[in-house]
């Protein structure tokens, strides 16, 4: 079983914010897939299954406690692989990077996952840039002129993610799909 986690915050006030690009990518995948909804309160998030071996998770614990949801799903399904999609303020909007393991880079959602599940998982890092005030920047909505770039990056990321799921070769996917901005 492969678990793909899209990080974000629940609630209308957080929709279309920079911190929610992980949720946005999961939603994009669900739009184009036949899925089974496995959402259950014990998973502390929205959980979907595509095919026989792919789980998509949107934690409902808020960003800083994402690990609670990830651990609940991972413990129940005994996933062989985990891929986490998240915003990254250290790379510009329009950029895309891939990584396995390492530090959380100050990202509280990753810190929570690392604490409860370890850090040996693949990461899809979607650049959102760094504003003057980090918190208001990541919790802020994309400007209209940024939405075109965001849409292109999400489509590109979707292709990369689907290939990563199939091929399990992070280095090759990184070489093929990483974007600079």
From Swiss-Prot:
Residues with site note (Discriminates between blocked and unblocked aminoacyl-tRNA): 9
Enzyme Commission number(s) from the entry: 3.1.1.29
Keyword set, alphabetical order: Cytoplasm, Hydrolase, RNA-binding, tRNA-binding
Identification of the protein by name: Peptidyl-tRNA hydrolase
Binding site for tRNA: 14, 62, 64, 108
CDD domains for the chain: PTH
The gene coding this protein: pth
Organism of derivation: Campylobacter jejuni subsp. jejuni serotype O:23/36 (strain 81-176)
Catalytic center residues: 19 (proton acceptor)
Any one GO MF annotation of this record: peptidyl-tRNA hydrolase activity
